[in-house]
Design a protein with these regions (language model features):
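Extracellular/periplasmic carbohydrate-active domains that bind, remodel
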Residues: 2-473
């Protein structure tokens, strides 16, 4: 009996405790050529990729044929469709007005040859640079829709392995910070300088790098997607959905398993991010499930352009995700974060409920070229350009967290900032937190707690350090 995708999501949401059984859900969901019930019906203004020479046999590289169908559809604002099968492809570029439909029984599978992903100007981890295109690109286009109940599979393990191999070389040399940029890996989907774009109902597997990257874009909707990046390993940097210096973005009903940040706001890194100075703003994230990730909802670490007017609600976060709500940055990032509202969050066995760490991961955050290295790419210089301290320390203010329940946590709060720029005007209301320890708050001003129940098993209250006007604890 086939399992319908929406029914699966409803069933998973209704039974959150049974997490171990969900780790292999993608295997049972994975359509193959033999599972396709029939060919997609040909409708007016549709473009069947097999009419352009695509094979869908899992081995033939179908990039040119699929791109030809996309280009033809762009002339009439048409729809690209697939018969059931496994289509191996390199980078595809969707065009204005195109609907790209990957139906049930179709798997679009990424090539494992990095040469099949052409280099192009983009932004990667906060730096503008040349980098391989994503598997699916909406690059300076508008009015594009990705839809269907099928699978887009990055087939990314070869890229995960190449990253870990490079880390083994770089870490002993003190250049761990460079590995993420030097190891070129394709994202699964990127919207770059795009407008009025929608992705819905798809299952996204095994991204080689970030899964959905929304960069310099506006009016973007991500709806009812399943992300499963931990199949066959745990891929590094396999963020779920990254919203990067973009505005008017809605993310709704995403169900995510990954090995980095699940839902993440970004806005540029250090000197380059401060130069671009483009915020992420007017973002709504709601009704999402985080099953396994580095953090549930993350702001940073690329904070240089700032974040404002971000509303997150209806989020469920489960073990083994280590942090539910995370603000992370560094003293070279800068940027202003304000107007953040986080509500209606449930966490089960998540070790840390909320963390603010503005000196996050120094080996990655602070780029310094060792004296013995003379030959290096230009972006190393960009990464290592000094940032004056007065510009480098980020400012966080006006954060409202309410209606949060956490059970089985180790620590409720791990919150700290710099004395030069303390955290300001945080409000916490209607929290019910069951944790081993209450935790600590440092360098905070004007924090208020109302209707907060904190059941700390060690019997201690929150440790306040270098803070003033903290009320209600």
């Amino acid at each position: 009996m086939s399992i319908q995708r929406r029914s699966l999501l409803q069933a998973l949401a209704a039974a959150p405790v049974a997490m171990p059984a969900l780790t292999g859900v993608t295997s049972s969901l994975a359509p193959t050529a033999s599972s396709a019930a029939s060919s997609s019906p040909k409708q007016p203004n549709t473009y069947q990729v097999k009419d352009f020479g695509a094979k869908g046999d899992g081995t033939t590289l179908d990039t040119k044929a699929i791109q030809a169908a996309i280009d033809a559809a762009a002339k009439t604002q048409g729809t690209v469709i697939f018969d059931g099968g496994v289509y191996t492809t390199g980078s595809l570029f969707l065009k204005n007005g195109v609907t790209f439909r990957v139906d049930q029984g179709v798997r679009l599978q990424g090539s494992q040859n990095i040469e099949d992903y052409p280099l192009l100007p983009t932004r990667v981890a906060g730096i503008e640079m040349t980098w391989p295109a994503a598997l699916i690109n909406v690059y300076q286009e508008q009015n594009v829709k990705l839809t269907g109940d099928g699978i887009i599979d990055g087939n990314g393990k070869v890229f995960w392995d190449s990253y870990w191999n490079l880390r083994r070389q770089y870490d002993p040399k003190g250049i761990r910070w460079a590995a993420d940029y030097d190891c070129r890996r394709p994202r699964l989907i990127q919207f770059f300088e795009a407008q009025n774009v929608r992705i819905e109902n798809l299952s996204l597997y095994r991204a080689g790098f970030w899964t959905v990257h929304i960069c310099y874009s506006q009016d973007v909707t991500v709806y009812n997607v399943i992300i499963r990046n931990n199949e066959g390993g745990r891929g590094p940097s396999t963020d779920g959905i990254d919203i990067d210096s973009s505005r008017k973005v809605l993310v709704e009903k995403a169900d995510i398993t990954c090995n980095d940040d699940a839902l993440c706001m970004k806005a540029g890194r250090d000197s380059d991010g401060l130069r671009v100075s483009r915020p992420t703003e007017d973002v709504v994230i709601r009704d999402c499930i985080i099953r396994d990730a580095a953090a549930g909802v993350t702001f940073g670490s690329e904070t240089s352009g700032g974040f404002k007017n971000v509303k997150v609600s209806g989020i469920k976060v489960y073990h083994p995700t280590p942090v539910g709500i995370l603000f992370k940055s560094a003293q070279t990032r800068g940027g202003s974060i304000s107007g953040i509202e986080i509500s209606d969050v449930f966490m089960q066995d998540v070790p840390v409920v909320m963390r603010v760490n503005l000196n996050w991961y120094p080996a990655y955050s602070y780029a310094k070229i060792p004296e013995g290295i003379k030959d290096y790419p230009g972006y190393w210089k960009t990464l290592s350009t000094p940032v004056p301290k007065e510009r480098g320390i980020p400012q966080l203010s006006d954060v409202y967290v309410h209606d949060v329940q956490a059970v089985g946590a180790k620590t409720a709060f791990e919150i700290s900032a710099y004395p030069e720029k303390p955290l300001k005007n945080f409000r916490f209301e209607r929290l019910h937190l069951d944790a081993w320890a209450a935790g600590s708050i440092a360098n905070a001003e004007d924090f208020s707690f109302k209707d907060v129940t904190l059941l700390s098993l060690d019997g201690k209250s929150v440790d306040l350090k270098q803070s003033k006007n903290v009320r209600g604890l």
